[in-house]
């Protein structure tokens, strides 16, 4: 019979571990906002206690808005996962952004619309190498409009998988969202489900997959970034 005993865990240690597993971490882009809100809260509280309460609520909201939940991507080969949390707005054939150099042949485009209440980080849809990253200035139309894909400010990224399959993911600014963050660079090796960017305050993300791919979602369906399988990819 084994006489080994499991190490004891103090209630405080258990509580800290539970909080770490329950409360999602915050994306680095949100730290200046949270810090600014916290400082403002402390200053205002000295003048009026009620302002301190409101400031505390604002600080908590900023931290919640920039949350970056832990996600586990499917391990299947030959699939593309959702690049963002949100609602599928469109599934259609469309020519990818010209700046990616993919030519004029249509690909299948799946558009995911994010409201202000959704998680606003973007996830890598396919493991592989980043072969192109291109930013283009544009308008700030409402992200749920069809022409937002063509007219709005955007940041496009092209990824080539190990088998040569290429997918593109495009961050699109919206009526309120006017700040696109992309941490990926050309030549980077990226993993499906990992965070690569963020769009502030409501936006849209377009995923382009090979035209003959089998799309597994439909308009109106909710997606979970890094986990929902968007399509089974046609081989290169």
Swiss-Prot record:
Its main location: membrane. The keyword Repeat does not apply. InterPro entries: PS_Dcarbxylase (IPR003817), PSD-A (IPR033175). The record marks 202-203 as: Cleavage (non-hydrolytic). Catalyzes the formation of phosphatidylethanolamine (PtdEtn) from phosphatidylserine (PtdSer). It comes from Saccharopolyspora erythraea (strain ATCC 11635 / DSM 40517 / JCM 4748 / NBRC 13426 / NCIMB 8594 / NRRL 2338). This is Phosphatidylserine decarboxylase proenzyme. Belongs to the phosphatidylserine decarboxylase family. PSD-A subfamily. It is a peripheral membrane protein. The active site is at residue 203. One of its GO terms (molecular function) is phosphatidylserine decarboxylase activity. Keywords: Cell membrane, Decarboxylase, Lipid biosynthesis, Lipid metabolism, Lyase, Membrane, Phospholipid biosynthesis, Phospholipid metabolism, Pyruvate, Zymogen. Heterodimer of a large membrane-associated beta subunit and a small pyruvoyl-containing alpha subunit. The modification Pyruvic acid (Ser) is found at residue 203. Binds 1 pyruvoyl group covalently per subunit. It comes from the Bacteria. Its cofactor is pyruvate. Is synthesized initially as an inactive proenzyme. Formation of the active enzyme involves a self-maturation process in which the active site pyruvoyl group is generated from an internal serine residue via an autocatalytic post-translational modification. Two non-identical subunits are generated from the proenzyme in this reaction, and the pyruvate is formed at the N-terminus of the alpha chain, which is derived from the carboxyl end of the proenzyme. It catalyses: a 1,2-diacyl-sn-glycero-3-phospho-L-serine + H(+) = a 1,2-diacyl-sn-glycero-3-phosphoethanolamine + CO2. One of its GO terms (cellular component) is plasma membrane. It is found in: Cell membrane. One of its GO terms (biological process) is phosphatidylethanolamine biosynthetic process.
């Amino acid at each position: 019979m084994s006489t080994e005993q499991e190490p004891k865990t103090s209630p405080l240690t258990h509580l800290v571990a539970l909080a770490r597993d329950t409360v999602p971490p915050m994306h680095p882009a949100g730290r200046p906002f949270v810090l600014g809100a916290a400082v403002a809260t402390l200053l205002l509280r000295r003048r009026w206690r009620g302002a301190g309460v409101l400031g505390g609520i604002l600080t908590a909201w900023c931290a919640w808005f920039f949350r970056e939940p832990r996600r586990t991507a499917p391990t299947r080969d030959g699939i593309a996962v959702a690049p963002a949390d949100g609602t599928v707005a469109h599934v259609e054939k469309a020519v990818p952004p010209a700046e990616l150099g993919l030519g004029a042949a249509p690909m299948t485009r799946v558009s995911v619309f994010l409201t202000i209440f959704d998680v606003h980080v973007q996830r890598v849809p396919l493991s592989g190498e980043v072969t192109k990253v291109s930013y283009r200035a544009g308008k700030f139309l409402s992200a749920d409009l069809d022409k937002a894909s063509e007219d709005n400010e955007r940041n496009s990224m092209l990824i080539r998988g190990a088998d040569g399959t290429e997918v593109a993911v495009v961050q699109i600014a919206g009526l309120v969202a006017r700040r696109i963050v992309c941490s990926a660079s050309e030549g980077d090796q990226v993993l499906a489900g990992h965070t690569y960017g963020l769009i502030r305050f409501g936006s849209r993300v377009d995923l382009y997959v090979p035209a003959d791919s089998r799309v597994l979602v439909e308009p109106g369906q909710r997606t979970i970034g890094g986990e929902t399988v968007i399509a089974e990819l046609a081989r290169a």
